[in-house]
Structure formats: structure tokens, C-alpha cells
């Protein structure tokens, strides 16, 4: 186990305990950044992923609930959602934090819900920014080259509005896999007044606009990702009574075969020691899963073996690979945007 804390106790305490203020970020690289949490190494193979001495660097703070990061090669920056602020922020080396898009997920004028903004972000093969939008209850596409604004990709299934699309991933053919839990509804999971679909589904949207319900068996589906060969779909379930990651074999037509539990952290989630539940996840080129969950980011082999954890000590929403050479893991951890250096 390797443990790293902020270089000064007062700074560490402020990172973990002070209420969120206006978002802020460093724009220089002269002074070492504060660090958060600890890195736990559980398998020798972890050193081939995260180099010894790596730290969880804090890039931005003062956020409400950071989520859904994605690296934009075109911008040379990471984009991420602040769901309660209804904003997509951009963080770029040397420039720090700026507002990229507001409103991001709810375009109405009346208060809708506490979590009305965008959540998961990704890019499709055409380079469009795909956004899961809570308040507008849709998937949208935005061209970074300008012109046309946002385009709604889907906002209903069989004539009924989605709950609050949460996370998405895209395959090489442009099919979008996304989850639809109820967290963005005005009353959250307990909402029966505005809810139209009685289940929390996992869906597939084709480039032609056809939507297929893949499964409704999960109580609270959340993060979603594909294996490198696109033959397995991973789905996180953020249910305290069944906190787990599922692995579903994909048929050639995009439908799912019966899934299996890849990893179960129900006991960990219910212990009271760790904050958070299975949430967003990404898969690296070797097939390892980098999955946010109780305590931070769980790094697992394709077989579900836990290799190590990036413990933030706070609820952690999602992560993504980024940098010019994909040399960093960017982490959305509650009020902070962080990153960890990876082995190239």
C-alpha cells in the first residue's frame, strides 16, 4: 500500500472538510498541487498501471458534484459535468478551469430538481459531444466545430420520456449504450408524479435512431463501458443492497446475453467506512476496469480481480483517461477534479 496526503495537514483538512465555494483551479505548474487520499496497491501488476510515487492531484475544487469526465483531443482539455450547477466545465493544462457549456442538461426556466444538469459525457466517432441530460431527460449531441447547436438524439422510449439518462459509451460503429436511473427526477428514486417509465433501463441507440431496451433487471444501473473487443458490456449498479458491477456478453446484433456479477462490493458499501457506490467506469486498452465505487476508484482485471484502489475518501462519480498520450486518469470526486499519472 502507498499512502499520500496533502503536504501540509491544514491543507489536507481543508480539502476534505471545508464547504464548497466557487469553483477554482490552478493554471500554473510551478507549485506542486495539493493531493487527496491514498493509493493502495494490492497486486504486483498494479505497478504496471500506476507508477510508484504517483499521487492523486487536485486540479479543481469548490464544485457541487463533479461527474462524467471525457478527454477532448481537439480541445486538449478534459470536459466534465457539475450536475447541480447545470454546467459543463473545461480544465486545460496552463489555463485551469473555465465554463464550457451552461445550461448543460436542463433548459427550462423553472426549478426542476437538485440534479438537473448533464451527467455522463462521451464522444461519438464523428467527434460530437454526447451528453446524458437529467433535466431535459434526453441524450444530445453537440458538434465542437460549431453550427447547429445541440441535437436531441433520443428523449423517449415507446412514447414515454426517460427518467434521467445517466451515463453512456459509444462503440466504433457509433452505437450508444446508456443507462437511465431516476436520480435526476424532481423527487429522485421516489418520484411517481413525473416518472413515465416504470423501470430503470439500459438501452442501445443506433446511428439511425433506433432505441432498444437491453435490460431492465438492474435496480439502479449507472456507469456503462465496453470491453476493448466490444464483446462485453459492463454496467455498474449503485444499489446499497446490491452494489456490484455486471458483465454482459454482447450478441452481434447488440443485444445482451445473460450477465454475470464481475465484482460485488455490497459489504464494503454497507460497512460505513467507505463513501459512495458503484458509479462511472472506464476500460483501458488491456481490458482493465477503472470503476468508481465505495472509497474511490477500484482497478480490476477483466476477470474482476482487484489490483488496487485510488482512495479519495469522498464519494467518487466517474473517471476518464486523458492527456496527449492518455497518460492520466482524470477523476471526478465530489467537489474536486483530480488526476493520477499512469504508466504510458
Regions found by a protein language model. Name each.
Residues 7-20:
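Bacterial N-terminal signal peptides
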Residues 1-6:
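N-terminal secretory signal peptides that target proteins for export/translocation
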Residues 27-344:
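Sequence-structural signature of mature extracellular/luminal beta-sheet repeat domains
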Residues 22-26:
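Sec/Tat signal peptide C-region and signal peptidase I cleavage site
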Amino acid at each position: 500500500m502507498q499512502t499520500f496526503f496533502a503536504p501540509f495537514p491544514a491543507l489536507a483538512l481543508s480539502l476534505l472538510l471545508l464547504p464548497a465555494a466557487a469553483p477554482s483551479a490552478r493554471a500554473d505548474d510551478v507549485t506542486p498541487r495539493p493531493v487527496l487520499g491514498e493509493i493502495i496497491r494490492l497486486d504486483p501488476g498494479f505497478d504496471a498501471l500506476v507508477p510508484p510515487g504517483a499521487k492523486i492531484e487536485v486540479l479543481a475544487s469548490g464544485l457541487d458534484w463533479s461527474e462524467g469526465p471525457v478527454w477532448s483531443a481537439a480541445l486538449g482539455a478534459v470536459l466534465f459535468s457539475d450536475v447541480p450547477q447545470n454546467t459543463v466545465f473545461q480544465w486545460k493544462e496552463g489555463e485551469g478551469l473555465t465554463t464550457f457549456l451552461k445550461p448543460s442538461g436542463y433548459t427550462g426556466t423553472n426549478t426542476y430538481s437538485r440534479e438537473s444538469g448533464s451527467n455522463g459525457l462521451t464522444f461519438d466517432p464523428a467527434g460530437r459531444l454526447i451528453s446524458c441530460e437529467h433535466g431535459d431527460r434526453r441524450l444530445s449531441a453537440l458538434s465542437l466545430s460549431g453550427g447547429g447547436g445541440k441535437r436531441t438524439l433520443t428523449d423517449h422510449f415507446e412514447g414515454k420520456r426517460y427518467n434521467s439518462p445517466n451515463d453512456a459509451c459509444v462503440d466504433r460503429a457509433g452505437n450508444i449504450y446508456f443507462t437511465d436511473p431516476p436520480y435526476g427526477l424532481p423527487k429522485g428514486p421516489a418520484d411517481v408524479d413525473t416518472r413515465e417509465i416504470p423501470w430503470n433501463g439500459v438501452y442501445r441507440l443506433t446511428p439511425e435512431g433506433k432505441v432498444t431496451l437491453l435490460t431492465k433487471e438492474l435496480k439502479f444501473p449507472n456507469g456503462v463501458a465496453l470491453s476493448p473487443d466490444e464483446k462485453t458490456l459492463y454496467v455498474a449498479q449503485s444499489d446499497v443492497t446490491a452494489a456490484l458491477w455486471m458483465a454482459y456478453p454482447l450478441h452481434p446484433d447488440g443485444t445482451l446475453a445473460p450477465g454475470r456479477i464481475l465484482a460485488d462490493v455490497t459489504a464494503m458499501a454497507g460497512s460505513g467506512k467507505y463513501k459512495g457506490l458503484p458509479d462511472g467506469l472506464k476500460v483501458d486498452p488491456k481490458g482493465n476496469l477503472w470503476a468508481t465505487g465505495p472509497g474511490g476508484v477500484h482497478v480490476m482485471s477483466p476477470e474482476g480481480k482487484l489490483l488496487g484502489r485510488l482512495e479519495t475518501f469522498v464519494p467518487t462519480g466517474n473517471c476518464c483517461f486523458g492527456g496527449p498520450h492518455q497518460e492520466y486518469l482524470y477523476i471526478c470526486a465530489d467537489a474536486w477534479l483530480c488526476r493520477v499519472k499512469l504508466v504510458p
